[in-house]
Amino acid sequence: MTFTDWPWRHWRQVRSQAPALRLNDEVLSWRALCERIDVLAGGFAAQGVREGDGVLLRAGNQPRTLLAWLALMQCGARVLPVNPQLPQTLLEALVPKLTLRFALTLEGENAFSGLTALQIQKSTAAYAVAWQPQRLVSMTLTSGSTGLPKAAVHTCQAHLASAQGVLSLMPFGPQDDWLLSLPLFHVSGQGIMWRWLFAGARMTVRDKQPLEQMLAGCTHASLVPTQLWRLLANRAAVTLKAVLLGGAVIPVELTDQASKQGIRCWCGYGLTEFASTVCAKEADGSDDVGAPLPGREIRIVDNEVWLRAASMAEGYWRDGKLIPLVNDEGWFATRDRGELNHGRLTIAGRLDNLFFSGGEGIQPEEVERVINAHPLVQQAFVVPVEDKEFGHRPVAVVEYASQAGDVNLAEWVRDKLARFQQPVRWLTMPSELKNGGIKISRRALQQWVCENCKN
């Protein structure tokens, strides 16, 4: 589909009174949504926001976060969403390089002295710049797992290409409703928003509450396996029929249970630089992440995954300039180790993470996939610690589900991992490393483990 106007305005023309968005329990039609966006955009314009301006949006998921984002885009702004829990020291290091003029803080304190503070205010004068699909609209921080995060910059066209690829595989129609279950400061949350806008379906945004309550009336959701395990175990009365799973290995037992309750499950592989999902498939219990979606291309060069796609970012933003993502051959080298078999991609892990123990190569992600398959594990990481005899030994750091109790993971992995792969020590994830993001810094984790293993 090709849009000739902002997607929400397009759907106002096509199906004006159809339900578009549910904000807590308030349902807005496409016409009503456009009216909300117009007056908010007018308010931002009255405060000086103009086309091309960089705006920092510090907020978690809530109804006014989404409306503000759409209104800022309609002003032509380049939006940088940030996690309210990011340390101020990190933001102080990042912000000066990102050419920002304004900051809209909906959670936390507005501590950006060099940026003009914006307020949510309505204006009787609606405001909108012309639709240009190639305009830069978002700056999304990479995970920063190995250093200072970079800001990947996407156009509307790239986001829509990402959405189109996913929806070519996963049905999402006008009568469906996708819960905004992931944060908009993460590319996975943005992916939900753009799929909704591409499909002209419905999306639900609710203030934070138990997942079962947030899912009321929703047909689609993006979840991690632990969340789906919990829903099924609690025999929750949900209206779900489709789930996009991410963040861990997908046990076939989980998808079989979901299927018995009428829920189809998909999984895949994505990157911030590619506006979310690159490969996907309906979950089938195999280790691969599926085939490239339409508009995506994959090469394997020296065991490294190379990508290019219509959804690729224009570059990394630094000091008012776009730093190219691609190499001299026009491909993005991911630093992920993988292989293609019959057109389907299998990811082994990060090339940078491989280490050796007694001469045996250990790819942490392969061990993590096994540990993460345990239904009481929220997430797990494996890092090397120095050892005089073996060179390095694997240590596991685990975040358990709240109801886990005593879990003997060492015994559980004994027949699932080679002996050299089995962690020699099991540590519980410290709260200070969970800064509210979806990904945890491996560098910080490594430092923490080394300190604890000295004791």
From Swiss-Prot:
Alphabetically sorted, this entry's keywords are:
ATP-binding, Ligase, Menaquinone biosynthesis, Nucleotide-binding
This protein's record includes keyword Phosphoprotein: no
Spell out the InterPro entries in the cross-references: AMP-bd_C, AMP-bd_C_sf, AMP-binding_CS, AMP-dep_synth/lig_dom, ANL_N_sf, MenE
Q: Which GO terms describe its molecular function?
A: ATP binding; o-succinylbenzoate-CoA ligase activity
Annotated signal sequence range: none
Enzyme Commission number(s): 6.2.1.26
What family classification does the UniProt entry report for this protein? Belongs to the ATP-dependent AMP-binding enzyme family. MenE subfamily.
Record protein name field = 2-succinylbenzoate--CoA ligase
Which species expresses this protein natively? Salmonella typhimurium (strain LT2 / SGSC1412 / ATCC 700720)
